[in-house]
Amino acid sequence: MSSRDSSIKAPVHPAAKAELKGRRILVVEDSPVVGPFTADLLGELGCEVVGPAPNMAAARELVEAGDFDAALVDIHIRGERVFPLCEMLEAQGVPFVFTSGYADRNMPEKWEDRPRVQKPYTLDQIEKALRGLFEEDPKS
């Protein structure tokens, strides 16, 4: 995934880039390939990356520290489900998008309607998901 081709690198609409520019996005991702790939995509959108957090302990520390506008959260981090972390994000009013490479049929009802991006994702999918978060929650 680290060497992207034109099918993955979609052009970024200038207005969308401006809307996301400077937004601090927490990345919770345990894959040593997907984490940096996601950070690269966010950089192309003008976002500042917090993380990537490769495990739950690092993710909890970053969430407790705050200082980000939204999060991209992999549903499974080293075999752990991330829902306790999501509770922390929700308590802080931080909007987030789930990412997953699995069909995850056992999603708790509370989180079923949460925005989600299926791996492997593209720049366009990440852009759309983040813009959706900020349109839903303009204060963030």
For each of these PLM feature ranges, what is it?
Residues 29:
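Conserved acidic carboxylate
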Residues 119:
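A Lys-centered signature of the CheY-like receiver
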